[in-house]
Each structure stands twice: as C-alpha cells, then as structure tokens.
C-alpha cells in the first residue's frame, strides 16, 4: 500500500488475492516509495501504454492481422494479473464493499451512508473506507447492489477478501465483453483485432476499469450481450438491455440506440420494450424502487478534469448564483449538439453478417448510434471519468477507423493521468494543491475542451448539415415503417483496409 495503492486491510491468513507486501515488511526495504516516484511512474506508464495502443491500431489499418486467439489470451492474462494486486488510485471499490456491508447488516444503502455506522461503532469492513464518499448513499442499480452484497457474503468480515471478489466482478465481465465483441466481428479479421485492442488489450481500459476495480464492465456486459441478440430476438435483446439498466441508469443510451435500430418495425420495437420492462419493472419496481431515484444524485456533480470547471469558474465571475445551473444546462444542450454532429460525420459500415444495407440493418444502426450517444454524453457531461469510456470503446471497435479513435485515446490519457492522484489521503500539500491541480484542472480540462472543439471542427469541415424542417418531417415519416426484406444474394463483406495497402495473404 502507498499513496497510489489502496490498503484493503490485512489478509488475516487468507490465501486469496489481492497480494501485496505487508506494510511492516515493506518498511524494512524503504517502502512505500515516495509519491514523487510512484506518481510520475504511473503517468509515464499510462502515456506509453496509450502510444502502444495507437501504434497497434495503426498497424491494423496498414494490414496487420495477428492471431486473434493469442491476442485474446494475452489480454486475459494481463487483466487477471492486474486484478490480483490491490486496486490503484481510486477508492471506489471500498465504497462498493461498504454498500454491500450495509446490506448484510440489514440496512438500506440508498438511505444510510457508511459514515453513519462507523462513526457510532467499530465495523471491520466500513473502517477501511476513505473520503470523500463516506457520507454518500449508493447511486447504483439493484444488480450492482446485489453484486456488492454477494461480495460481502463471499468475503465475510474481511475487507481484503471482499475487495478480491469485487475485483473478479470487474475483470470477468470485461473479458466476456471482449468475447462477445469478437463474435460480433466474425469473418472480419481487422474488426476482430480492433475488438481485442479496444477492450481487454486497451491499456487505458485495463488501467481505468480493472486496476481501479470499477463496476463499468458489469454495467456494460449485459448491453453488449443485448447487441449479440439484435438480429436474433428483439424480446431477448430487451431482456438484456433491461438488465443493463438495472446496473446503472446510464445504459439508457444503449436502450435508445436499440430502439433506433428497430425503429422501422413497430413489432420489434414493441418486443424490445416488453423485454426491457420485465427486468426493470421487477428489479426497480419490486426490489429496489429507491435505486431509480438515487441515480439522479450524480447529475448535479462537476468533476475535476472535465470541461465544466473552466466554464463554471468563468460564469462565477458574472453570475455566481447561477453558474452551476448554467453549466449543467450547457452539458445537456451540448449532448444534443455533439450527438447531432457525430451523426453527420461517422461513416456507415455494416456490422459483419448484415443481410440489409448498413442504413437499414438494426445491429449496424444500434452500434453506430450507441457510439454517437455515448460519446456525446461522456464528452459533454460535467461529471466524467476515464472508466466511463468503456461504453464507447467497445462498440467503436466495430466501426471503421476515424479521428474519433484518436480523440478517445487523447481524452483517456488526460483523464487517467489526472486521476493518478485521485485519492484524498496520503498526498502532500504540494502534490495536491500544485501538481495535481495543474494536471487535472488545467491540462486535463484543456484536453477535454480540445476534444469538443475537434468534434465541432470535424463536423464543420466534413459534413456541415443542420436538422431542417424537411429532414425532421422525413425522419418522422420513416418511423415504425417495416424494414426491407433481406436480399437473397449479396456479395460477402470484405475487410476494410487503407487504399493502396495489400491485405493479408
């Protein structure tokens, strides 16, 4: 344990991970290392990893086709090794454990905070939580809460063992996501390679999701499985997207993408809706009605490193009382504006296996729309973090290479580096008030503004179309119109490649 490595508590003889050098042993060898060593080392590691990712996907564009199974197994090994050491730089996993502990004690984590308990009496699990979220009730959906309860059941009264089970609940869904993405890209070696590179071999996601033990993969895995069933059964697709929404409400964007994909056939929209309502109605309506409203607590936050601090600070000079509200409103407006712009510039390419043109294939439409909506959300939300990017990286793998790949990598590097000092304990005043402030609130926020400006420039110079009245009328006229019948004969889709570059032989 150090300033960047969580202390999950003593193992007390447990043979389970996470494995680490006990504090008393480390002191004999001069451990933990100074913050001025470990923090820059992580900055360098994250940056080098991102550069490696860019080199790899450029190689794919130039014709590199590695053996997918070897790539996949390498990714599995790297992620499992990452998951057996203590989580790094974020104490969120300790809060997951705390919410599960409250449930084991018979309390409601949506009403009671961990601090309300451990300030009154000693608790072997809650005592290991860290600021600043100890006074915050849960904002997670019922499935996420169930996973937190299950980790407590398996881990008993040991925070160490509970953290291990929560790490497994982060890494296993992450691996499943990659597996499904490879299946979705079947028959196209380039897309399959991108699917591995953009998920379990993506250093930015290994760092943000697995090293931080965040529950983003548990959130997304149901939505990705829903994509697998799009061409098979709208009802089953609805079941899985409903389960995704029961982990985190933010998966509503995937739900909207699926509705948009099926919009030409009202019967499929109806089946999708019925399927989604079953898990949502049961899990939210019967087991955890408060969870649906708890998620709204996140909408009022502003995170360091996003575009919002600059805007809020500027507005505070002239409208101090309204600055926060105006910033939040601009985020919502930006969601629609950036979403529209991305819809005009992202190219169409049918997901492998399509029997209809790309613009009419429900899976292709859903994947492209998910990328558009989720990208628009993460780049315009006043509260945005690097592990949120998983919901964009996964479907982005099925699109042709565009400048959005670069923008996602740039954004991910900035936010990941910014939150190396994300914990609120253990750092010196100079590190927090000077270095961390500069990295997070100056450099990272500047990068987020650059990403927004780059998307606007992309739209302005590529396909500057605005939603005219005729466009809107035509769009409404196409809603719920039965889709074209599959064409009986189509030439097989060929893997994309850069013009003038020979493909694999």
Protein language model features and the residues they cover:
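Transmembrane helical bundles and short interhelical boundary loops of multi-pass, membrane-embedded
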Residues: 1-42, 280-374, 399-505
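Loop-to-helix entry region of an early transmembrane alpha helix in multi-pass inner-membrane enzymes
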Residues: 40, 142, 146, 156-176, ...
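Transmembrane-helix motifs of polytopic, lipid-linked glycan transferases
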Residues: 48-58, 161-188, 336-344
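Intramembrane catalytic core of multi-pass membrane enzymes that act on lipidic substrates
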Residues: 64-167
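Transmembrane-helix signature of polytopic, membrane-embedded enzymes
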Residues: 65-73, 181-204
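Specific aromatic-rich, kink-prone transmembrane helix
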Residues: 176-180, 219-234, 374
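Membrane-interface alpha helices of multi-pass inner-membrane proteins
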Residues: 206-209, 225-226, 234-259, 372-379
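Perimembrane helix-loop-helix junctions
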Residues: 253-278
């Amino acid at each position: 344990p150090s300033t960047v490595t969580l202390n999950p508590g003593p193992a007390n003889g447990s043979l389970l991970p996470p494995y680490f050098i006990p504090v008393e042993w480390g002191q004999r060898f001069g451990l933990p290392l100074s913050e001025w060593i470990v923090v820059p080392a992580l900055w360098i590691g994250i940056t080098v990893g991102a550069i490696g990712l860019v080199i790899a996907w450029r190689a794919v564009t130039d014709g590199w086709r590695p053996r997918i199974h070897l790539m996949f197994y390498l990714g599995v090994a790297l992620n499992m090794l990452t998951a057996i050491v203590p989580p790094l730089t974020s104490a969120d996993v300790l809060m997951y454990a705390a919410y599960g502990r409250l449930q084991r004690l018979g309390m409601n984590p949506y009403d009671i905070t961990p601090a309300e308990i451990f300030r009154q009496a000693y608790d072997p699990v809650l005592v290991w939580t860290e600021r600043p979220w100890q006074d915050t009730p849960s904002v997670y959906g019922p499935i996420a809460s169930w996973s937190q309860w299950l980790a407590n059941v398996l881990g008993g009264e040991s925070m160490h063992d509970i953290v291990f089970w929560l790490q497994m609940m982060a890494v296993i869904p992450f691996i499943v996501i990659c597996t499904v993405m490879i299946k979705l890209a079947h028959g196209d070696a380039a897309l399959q390679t991108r699917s591995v590179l953009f998920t379990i071999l993506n250093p930015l996601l290994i760092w943000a999701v697995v090293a931080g033990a965040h529950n983003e993969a548990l959130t997304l895995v149901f939505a990705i499985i829903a994509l697998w069933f799009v061409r098979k059964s709208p009802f089953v697709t609805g079941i899985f997207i409903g389960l995704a929404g029961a982990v985190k409400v933010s998966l509503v964007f995937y739900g909207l993408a699926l509705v948009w994909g099926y919009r030409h056939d009202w019967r499929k929209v109806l089946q999708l809706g019925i399927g989604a309502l079953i898990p949502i109605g049961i899990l939210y309506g019967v087991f955890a009605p408060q969870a649906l409203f708890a998620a709204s607590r996140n909408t009022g936050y502003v995170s360091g490193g996003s575009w919002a601090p600059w805007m809020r600070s500027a507005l505070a000079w002239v409208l101090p009382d309204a600055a926060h509200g105006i910033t939040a409103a601009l985020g919502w407006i930006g969601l629609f504006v950036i979403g529209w712009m991305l819809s005009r510039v992202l190219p169409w390419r049918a997901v492998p296996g399509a029997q209809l043109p790309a613009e009419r294939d429900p899976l292709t439409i859903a994947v492209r729309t998910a990328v558009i909506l989720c990208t628009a959300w993460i780049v315009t939300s006043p509260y945005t973090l690097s592990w949120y990017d998983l919901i964009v990286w996964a479907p982005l793998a099925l699109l042709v290479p565009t400048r959005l790949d670069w923008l996602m990598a740039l954004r991910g590097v900035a936010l990941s580096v910014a939150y190396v000092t994300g914990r609120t304990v253990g750092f010196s005043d100079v590190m927090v008030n000077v270095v961390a402030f500069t990295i997070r609130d100056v450099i990272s926020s500047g990068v987020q503004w650059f990403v927004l400006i780059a998307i606007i420039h992309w739209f302005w110079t590529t396909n500057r179309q605005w939603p005219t009245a005729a466009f809107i009328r035509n769009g409404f006229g196409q809603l719920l119109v039965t889709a074209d019948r599959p064409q009986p004969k189509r030439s097989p889709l060929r893997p994309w490649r850069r013009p003038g570059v020979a493909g694999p032989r």
